[in-house]
Amino acid sequence: MTQANNHANNHAMNIGVFIPIGNNGWLLSENAPQYMPSFELNKQITLKAEQYGLDFALSMIKLRGFGGKTEFWDHNLESFTLMAGLAAVTSRIKLYATAPTLCLPPAIVARMASTIDSISNGRFGLNLVTGWQRPEYSQMGLWPGDEYFGRRYAYLSEYAQVLRDLWETGSSDLKGEFFQMEDCRLSPRPQAEMKIICAGQSAAGMAFTATYADYNFCFGKGVNTPTAFAPTVERLEEAKAKTGRDVSSYVLFMIISDETDEAARAKWEHYKAGADQEAIAWLGLQGAADTKSGADTNIRQMADPTSAVNINMGTLVGSYATVAALLDEVVTVPGTGGVLLVFDDFLKGLDDFGTKIQPLMASRRHVTGEALAEVA
């Protein structure tokens, strides 16, 4: 047994699915599956995830897309209403919506979250985003000016404090630079502890996460390099040391699998050959608009031309056995709690994951059972 397998045996890994709330999921390619988002599609995906024992489903928010031949992310559902619908048709899986904090006041978000907590019987949590793509907000007159790029996490810190006050005590009197609460009330409060996700990778984002969040989401890096994200987790561990809070990292990967390594690689090369260069160029322009942040932000990685066909997220390409082994390596990085997965073809990809990949994973034996993993 490999050292990675030994480690994975001792460290159970949580797995979530990043559901495709926007058209075409996460592939900017004319050669990838082309589809519109719908409640029905996301319901099928989330129910499959629940069936296969996945731990959570997360939806993003995107208010304006990248255009191009594939009209990438020009078509998007809204996160809270989607997750409320999914909460009503699921029974076990945890659900996370994303709050566009420039659009929604924190007291309203706190109440929406409490409502979905009620629908789901305590299975709901929240992902907070500051907003990095100016046109998403300027189109509705809500962009606060480009100086906001340098103040995003000061704004988000006040926002999160209002949420925590309301969820934990039922009232907030915060008087800050961005928000002024006047005996603001919330009832009923959530029945379960409300968990917060943040995906900040800059120094300011890490400091925010270590102070206010429960989970940090970060990008995997490279193709078939499942531990290359380790320096990002190390930076969070340093930030956590200053706050003393328990925050774990979850890593985003795209899974492209097939019966053989060669077949999976051919699929990946085919997607890259059809890259939507117009949409990729738009992504690069939006990334360059933020001149206030450093080189360590998510958008800097997304816009890198190296593998922009899937916004440079970590990609695991191979046979079912290869992908299972690569995923088991992820959890060997100290501070890693799990992974967030996307697929080139979500319905088939989830079936393949649930029936052919997960049973081979040492880090998922708490889900599949020891005997099944050994037989496979």
UniProtKB/Swiss-Prot annotation:
Record: residues binding FMN: I61, K62, N127, E136, R152, Y153, S202
EC numbers for this chain: 1.14.99.46
GO MF entry, a single one: alkanesulfonate monooxygenase activity
Record keyword NADP present: yes
Enzyme type, top EC level: oxidoreductase
Entry-linked Pfam families: Bac_luciferase
Keyword Hydrolase: no
InterPro entries per UniProt: Luciferase-like_dom, Luciferase-like_sf, Pyrimidine_monooxygenase_RutA, SsuD_RutA_monooxygenase
Gene Ontology BP annotations: alkanesulfonate catabolic process; nitrogen utilization; uracil catabolic process
Stored Gene3D superfamilies: Luciferase-like domain
Catalytic activity: uracil + FMNH2 + NADH + O2 = (Z)-3-ureidoacrylate + FMN + NAD(+) + H2O + H(+); thymine + FMNH2 + NADH + O2 = (Z)-2-methylureidoacrylate + FMN + NAD(+) + H2O + H(+)
Recorded superkingdom: Bacteria
Keywords linked to the UniProt accession: Flavoprotein, FMN, Monooxygenase, NADP, Oxidoreductase
Family named by the database record: Belongs to the NtaA/SnaA/DszA monooxygenase family. RutA subfamily.
Function, in words: The FMN-N(5)-oxide reacts spontaneously with NADH to produce FMN. Requires the flavin reductase RutF to regenerate FMN in vivo.
Record's protein name: Pyrimidine monooxygenase RutA
Source species: Methylorubrum populi (strain ATCC BAA-705 / NCIMB 13946 / BJ001)
